[in-house]
Design a protein with these regions (language model features):
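Short S/T/G/P-rich N-terminal loop/turn motif that feeds into the first structured element of a domain
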Residues: 1-93, 100-108, 124-189
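A common structural junction motif
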Residues: 113-119, 125
Length: 189
């Protein structure tokens, strides 16, 4: 890994500078969505021989202490069960981390324990996207929407079922159009 970019992705330097230099008056929480694709076998840059998987190496990385030190919290962590739609990348894991400020995201990366454990992430990751987000207000359901009768569903949920989380990550080719809901998503409203 060089000082600019890890082997598993390209750093958007402009966004990094924005995160680091946002004035305290304008700063606030940021949610970082992490899409992770692991190497089949971990590949350490120091040349050590290993048979552990990329996911196992990333589990060694686990930056819980660094996150806690800057006031961040993991709000979602899950292994991908199914990928319904997307390009050629089939993601293995998704994490969403809420940082109290944009600067705290940068501060975490300067912590010695983070830098020491990062070698495991570098060894484990084939590719990752880290996407800074701000939550949107969910649309209110139409007033005439009737609740679903689970008796009409072939495989209704049971009290033993866990939650299902669906994450839809959009990439807009036309950044100016990114503030508008794509026409094909109007049906979701």
């Amino acid at each position: 890994m060089n000082s600019s970019n890890p082997r598993y992705g390209l750093v958007d330097r402009e966004y990094g500078i924005q995160l680091a230099t946002t004035s305290p008056a304008d700063d606030g929480p940021v949610w970082m969505v992490n899409l992770m694709k692991y190497r089949e076998v971990a590949d350490y840059v120091d040349g050590r021989k290993t048979t552990i998987s990329g996911q196992a190496a990333d589990d060694l990385y686990s930056p819980i202490d660094s996150l806690t030190a800057v006031g961040a919290e993991i709000v979602f962590l899950g292994d991908v069960d199914q990928q319904l739609l997307g390009d050629n990348t089939v993601w293995d894991r998704i994490a969403v981390v809420k940082y109290p400020t944009r600067k705290s995201f940068i501060d975490m990366q300067a912590r010695p324990e983070f830098q020491e454990s990062h070698k495991h992430k570098d060894a484990g990751m084939d590719k990752t996207f880290v996407i800074g987000c701000q939550p949107l207000q969910a649309a209110e359901p139409p007033p005439d929407l009737e609740p679903l009768d689970w008796a009409d569903v072939p495989h209704p949920p049971t009290k033993d079922d866990g939650p299902v989380v669906v994450m839809h990550v959009l990439r807009f080719e036309d950044v100016d159009a990114g503030v508008q809901t794509p026409a094909y998503m109007e049906a979701y409203k």
